[in-house]
């Protein structure tokens, strides 16, 4: 009996150690790239070309609201920017065509200068950054095994268990976990689990009899 308990404890310790080691390996791969860490901390994918982005020329409303926004913000310091924008939009609609005309003329002048300075400019709206998830899914057996380990630190193991599947939280091709290394670790964990199950059945005849009865006489 003590031999069975010691064997089970040893198997549990081996599995826990392998999972923690796998988590540390993933964490190291995640933090060894300073460029990737910078993108992760700032929440964006900044490139050198983004620094020289050409701003879109102002339209009539932008010319008018440039000073009005500052005025409303000074008069209402507690008002949020979204509320200020709503108020400015309402005030702009209430203006007459004669009141709007000077701002349309100023906007045309600004746009003409912009075309002269940037003749090849084309407006391209920026797309929202979408986090890139790894296209590699770990096996369901390994995922369920990780879900059963309640003591794995989330800081060490950047995966989420959902519906028997595990998806890596890395972004970018250079940050993805090496598939061959992950496969070796998964194979090792599965072998350890199979070895522990076989050892427990071999040392416990009652459990073995129940398992055989379940296999031959399914419900």
Swiss-Prot record:
Gene3D superfamilies: High mobility group box domain. GO terms for cellular component: cytoplasm; nuclear speck; nucleus. Coiled coil: none annotated. Its main location: nucleus. It is found in: Nucleus speckle; Cytoplasm; Nucleus. Residues 54-122 bind DNA. One of its GO terms (molecular function) is DNA-binding transcription activator activity, RNA polymerase II-specific. SMART domains: HMG. GO terms for biological process: cell differentiation; male sex determination; sex differentiation. The keyword Ribosomal protein does not apply. It comes from the Eukaryota. Keywords: Activator, Calmodulin-binding, Cytoplasm, Differentiation, DNA-binding, Nucleus, Sexual differentiation, Transcription, Transcription regulation. InterPro entries: HMG_box_dom (IPR009071), HMG_box_dom_sf (IPR036910), SRY (IPR017253), SRY-related_HMG-box_TF-like (IPR050140). The keyword Transcription regulation applies. Transcriptional regulator that controls a genetic switch in male development. It is necessary and sufficient for initiating male sex determination by directing the development of supporting cell precursors (pre-Sertoli cells) as Sertoli rather than granulosa cells. Involved in different aspects of gene regulation including promoter activation or repression. Binds to the DNA consensus sequence 5'-[AT]AACAA[AT]-3'. SRY HMG box recognizes DNA by partial intercalation in the minor groove and promotes DNA bending. Also involved in pre-mRNA splicing. Interacts with CALM, EP300, HDAC3, KPNB1, ZNF208 isoform KRAB-O, PARP1, SLC9A3R2 and WT1. The interaction with EP300 modulates its DNA-binding activity. The interaction with KPNB1 is sensitive to dissociation by Ran in the GTP-bound form. Interaction with PARP1 impaired its DNA-binding activity. Belongs to the SRY family. This is Sex-determining region Y protein.
């Amino acid at each position: 009996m003590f031999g069975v308990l010691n064997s089970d404890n040893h198997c549990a310790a081996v599995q826990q150690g392998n999972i923690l080691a796998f988590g540390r390996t993933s964490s190291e791969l995640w933090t060894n790239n300073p460029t990737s860490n910078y993108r992760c901390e700032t929440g964006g994918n900044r490139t050198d070309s983004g620094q020289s982005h050409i701003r879109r020329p102002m339209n009539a409303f932008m010319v008018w609201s440039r000073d009005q926004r500052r005025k409303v913000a000074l008069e209402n310091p507690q008002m949020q920017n979204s509320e200020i924008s709503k108020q400015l939009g309402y005030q702009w609609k209430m203006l007459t065509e004669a009141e709007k005309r000077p701002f349309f003329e100023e906007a045309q002048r600004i746009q003409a200068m912009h075309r002269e300075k940037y003749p090849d400019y084309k407006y391209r709206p920026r797309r929202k950054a979408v986090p890139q998830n790894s296209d590699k899914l770990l096996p369901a057996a390994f995922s369920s095994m990780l879900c059963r380990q309640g003591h794995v630190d989330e800081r060490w193991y950047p995966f989420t268990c959902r519906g028997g599947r595990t998806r890596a939280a890395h972004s970018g091709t250079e940050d993805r976990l090496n598939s061959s290394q992950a496969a070796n670790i998964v194979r090792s964990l599965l072998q350890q689990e199979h070895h522990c199950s076989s050892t427990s059945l071999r040392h416990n005849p009652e459990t073995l009899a129940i398992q055989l009865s379940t296999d031959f006489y399914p419900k």
